[in-house]
Structures are given as C-alpha cells and as structure tokens.
C-alpha cells in the first residue's frame, strides 16, 4: 500500500509533549488501526531507511519522543482481547492491545469487576508507555507497574511478532519491560488484574522534622503511601491508604481543585517566575495554608479521611505544565538526602540564587527481586490470601535498564518488608505557569548532585541533566539542558546494559527504531 496516500498517514503534524516542554515536526504521522497496518508501516520504513518513533500520550516531559522522521501513535490499537480468570478467583489475566490508555483500561476493567493492582499518579499513558518507561506507584508492597505484566508481544523491525514472558524469551522480556521504545513496538500486553477494590486513605499535615523522626515507621505501615514535601512551608502531607470494604465517601475538598483556586495559584506562580522570583516562598506558604492548613494533624485525629475507588484514590491532580526530575535510591538514605536538599534550598533562597516549587514528591517501591531466578509463573495465592495486601505479581524479573538499586535484599510483597528492601523516589517538580519556563538548571544541578551521591539514578522519561552539569552555561537557552548519562552509564548498568544493546541490535539491525538518535547517544545507549 502507499503509505503517503494511506488514511493512516498525515503530513504537517506538530508533535509536542503534554507539558509543552519540547516539540517536533515528523515527516509523517501514523495512527494505524490494525496490526496489519502497523506491520506495513514498519516494513516500509525499513525498506526506505526511515526511522520510527512510537508515542502514546507524550506525558514524558523530556525530548525522548522528538523526531523529524516517522511518528507512530497507537491510540487506535486499544481493544481488550481476552480475559482469563484464575481458578482461585484472586486474579484475572487480561490481554489488551498495548495502545490502550490506562484510563480506558480502567473503564474496561471496571465493567468486568476488575482493577489494576497498582497505578502511577496519572492514567493518561498507554499500556505500552508505562511499560517502556518504568512507571511506578508508591507502595512498599508493589514494584513497577510492569510487575503486573505476564507476557508481551512485540513487533520487531522485520514486522515479525515475538512473544516474550518469564518462560518464553525471558531475556527479551527483561529488555522489553523498560525498552524506551527502542527494541520494537509492544502490540499486546497481558496484565495480572485483581477484583475491583476500594481504598481507605488518611491524610495528615506533618512537619519536616516529624517526617524524619518517624521515617523508620512510616513506609511499611500501609499498603500505599506517598509524601509531599513543601520546603518553604516547612510542612509535608503524609498520605497513606489500605484496601477497604467501607462505603465510598465524598472526595476530599481541594482549594486549588476549583477553577478559581487553580487560576489564582497559576497566576501567582507566573508572577513569581516572570517578575518577582523572591516572592516564591511566600506564594508556596500561602497556597499550602489555603489547601491544607498549617496545623500538624498526625496523632490528633484531625486529619482527613476518604474511601475511594482504586483509580480515584491512587491517581492525583498534577495541576499545571511542568518539568519533573525524579531519581530512585535506597530508602535508608532518605533522611540524609532530604536534610541536604533542605539545606541547599534554604541557602539558595537566602542568597537569591534560585527558588523551587512544591511539592517535592517522596515515594517508595519494593523492587527487590529473588536471587534464585524464580520467574513466578504461578504466584503464591496462599500467601496473598493470608496478607490480603501487596502484589500478585505477573513476573519477578528485573528490567535490564531498571533504575532501582540492585543491592536491596529480597522481600516478598506478602512477607516481612522493611525499609532496607525498598527504593525511595524523590521527584523535583518545577511548574511552567501558562506555558512559561521556570529556571531549573541551578536547582536541578544541586538536586542531582545530592541524590546521585546517595546511590540514585534518574527516571528515564523525565528531565534529568546528567553528570556533566558543571558544563552548563548560565544563560536561558542552556538552562536545564540534558547532557545525558553517557559518562556514567556503563558503571551504573554494566552487563545489563551490554545485554540490552545486544538485543536491540539483534532485533533491529538496520536501526528502524533508532529515532531520536541524539537522545540515545547522549545517554550512552547506542
């Protein structure tokens, strides 16, 4: 077929990230509606020497998906294919076309009385996207969202479909669980889902000192947990949740969840970014007091409670366009890291060097894996029945490019989990009020220096700078520019990186999926 004249092809398409941080103009844009159409696109690209970039919601705020060649969006490959309930009734394996967005999948599962076991902060991404970028939620009893994946079907550069799982092509499976879209195109995914559930959450205002003092006791007390730190308010929000059979409640009131509150907040941010940077601490303190109040509510019985469906409880409002820079490190290092970040933030504000936005998001995951190589084809349903919390895993294999610490001792999601088993994620968000860039370079340089020293690695899909940040020029055009991980990546990933590169070359020898080659090169992935 002639792709240029095909209804799947579009010229003059402008592609940008959800946050508006980057944009590009691909020569052709495709939205295939069938596997056969997608195969034709891939084989034609190979024959013509073109490269393909695959994109879903474009929620990665980095230039990871920018291309001047062919861009393929999988939104029309969004069908649920099959449902396979386990005899125990504890889980159902669901196969879907991988272009389906998570919010669409949530609705499909809801109609079947099912739910995903764990979610990230949003549900806008595609299934292929959350797998390919290493998306995670926040729980001591769950790992990456891809921990729910039982098997994948990938279209490689020849147009052939390959199935991989813990039992079939397990090394390809490990590479595909965090592929960055460079091995091929995930067309089908089988996910391990569970009966629909509600979660009962409590939310408290705590001081920074309380967070540090209670660190050892916080992270494993509930199935789900997240902390938002507001440095200028010297307060944190502690949110914890567990599965519940209580009746649904009204959602929590939100001051900046209203149209007027949201507009007012974004306007104040715009003023502080464009006109009056030193106003930022006052803005952040004011907004915190309006949204949450300043009183420490932990232990006083005055915190808020809510019972919500799993999706509504685990997702959150990310507010405005933003830069995000998130790193994962051993959770035990958290108190020292946060103290060091606080000192940098306070010193920078005192000397009018830079100002940060809130919240700094603090989360955790259990990405420990068994040393035995147990591939967990059949999860231990008896363990889950006894604990009633944690993941019924689709696999227990570590992605080759997983950012989580390799030295965490293994703890079953249904067993005795301690802080030493866990990864800490710290996410530094900087808003772009009304599309205006906030200066991020100096803050992100300080941030990365501290988290890297603590054994951290950056989330692949976010706005990390890389270890050469000292070479950044202090001018607007270079502010926040990604220099990449090339100087350090071999040390960080070693044999796993070699294996990932070898598989990439094996299944894509002509480089069909090497679109965005500059990004790949600066991060040492070529």
Curated annotation (Swiss-Prot):
Keywords: FAD, Flavoprotein, Membrane, Mitochondrion, Oxidoreductase. Pfam families: ALO, FAD_binding_4. InterPro entries: ALO_C (IPR007173), FAD-bd_PCMH (IPR016166), FAD-bd_PCMH-like_sf (IPR036318), FAD-bd_PCMH_sub1 (IPR016167), FAD-bd_PCMH_sub2 (IPR016169), FAD_lactone_oxidase-like (IPR010031), Oxid_FAD_bind_N (IPR006094), Sugar_lactone_oxidase (IPR030654). Gene3D superfamilies: 3.30.465.10, Uridine Diphospho-n-acetylenolpyruvylglucosamine Reductase, domain 2. It is found in: Mitochondrion membrane. It comes from the Eukaryota. Residues 22-196 form the FAD-binding PCMH-type domain. One of its GO terms (molecular function) is myosin V binding. It catalyses: D-arabinono-1,4-lactone + O2 = dehydro-D-arabinono-1,4-lactone + H2O2 + H(+). GO terms for biological process: cellular response to oxidative stress; dehydro-D-arabinono-1,4-lactone biosynthetic process; mitochondrion inheritance. Its cofactor is FAD. NCBIfam families: FAD_lactone_ox. This is D-arabinono-1,4-lactone oxidase.
């Amino acid at each position: 077929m002639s792709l240029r004249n095909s209804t799947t092809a579009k010229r003059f398409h402008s592609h940008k990230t959800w946050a508006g941080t980057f944009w590009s103009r691909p020569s052709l844009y495709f939205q295939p509606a069938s596997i056969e159409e997608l195969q034709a696109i891939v084989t034609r690209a190979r024959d013509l020497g073109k490269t393909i970039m695959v994109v879903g919601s474009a929620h990665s705020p980095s230039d990871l998906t920018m291309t001047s060649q062919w861009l393929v969006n999988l939104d029309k490959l969004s069908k649920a294919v099959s449902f396979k309930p386990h005899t125990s009734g504890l889980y159902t394996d669901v196969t879907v076309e991988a272009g389906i967005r998570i919010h669409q999948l949530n609705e499909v599962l809801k109609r079947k009385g099912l739910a995903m076991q764990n979610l990230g902060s949003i549900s806008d991404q595609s299934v292929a996207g959350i797998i390919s970028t290493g998306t995670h939620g926040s729980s001591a009893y769950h790992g990456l969202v891809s921990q729910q994946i039982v098997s994948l079907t990938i279209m490689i550069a020849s147009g052939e479909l390959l199935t991989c799982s813990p039992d079939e092509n397990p090394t390809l499976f490990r590479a595909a669980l965090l592929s960055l879209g460079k091995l091929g195109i995930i067309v089908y995914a089988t996910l391990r889902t569970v009966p629909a559930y509600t979660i009962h959450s409590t939310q408290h205002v705590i001081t920074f000192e309380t967070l540090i003092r209670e660190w050892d006791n916080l992270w494993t007390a509930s199935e789900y947990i997240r902390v938002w730190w507001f440095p200028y308010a010297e307060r944190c929000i502690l949110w914890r949740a567990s599965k519940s059979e209580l009746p649904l409640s009204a959602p929590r009131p939100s001051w900046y969840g209203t149209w007027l509150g949201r507009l007012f907040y974004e306007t104040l941010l715009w003023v502080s970014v464009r006109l009056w940077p030193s106003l930022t601490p006052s803005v952040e303190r004011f907004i915190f007091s309006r949204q949450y109040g300043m009183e420490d509510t932990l232990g006083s019985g005055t915190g808020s409670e809510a019972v919500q469906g799993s999706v509504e409880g685990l997702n959150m409002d990310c507010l405005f366009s933003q830069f995000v820079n998130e790193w994962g490190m051993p959770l035990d290092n958290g108190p020292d890291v946060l103290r060091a970040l606080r000192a940098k933030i306070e010193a920078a504000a005192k000397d009018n060097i830079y100002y940060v936005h809130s919240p700094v998001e603090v989360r955790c995951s259990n990405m420990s894996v068994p040393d035995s190589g147990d591939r967990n084809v059949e999860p231990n349903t008896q363990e889950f029945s006894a604990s009633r919390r944690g993941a019924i895993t689709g696999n227990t294999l570590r992605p080759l490019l997983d950012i989580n610490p390799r030295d965490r001792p293994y703890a079953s999601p249904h067993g005795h989990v301690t802080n030493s088993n866990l990864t800490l994620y710290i996410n530094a968000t900087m808003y772009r009020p009304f599309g205006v860039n906030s200066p991020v370079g100096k803050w992100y340089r300080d941030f990365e220096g501290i988290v890297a020293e603590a054994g951290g690695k950056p989330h692949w899909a976010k706005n990390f700078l890389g270890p050469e940040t000292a070479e950044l020029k202090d001018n607007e055009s270079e502010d926040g520019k990604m220099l990449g991980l090339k100087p350090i990546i071999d040390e960080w990933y070693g044999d796993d990186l070699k294996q990932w590169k070898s598989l990439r070359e094996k299944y894509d020898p002509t480089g069909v999926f090497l679109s965005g080659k500059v990004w790949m090169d600066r991060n040492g992935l070529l």
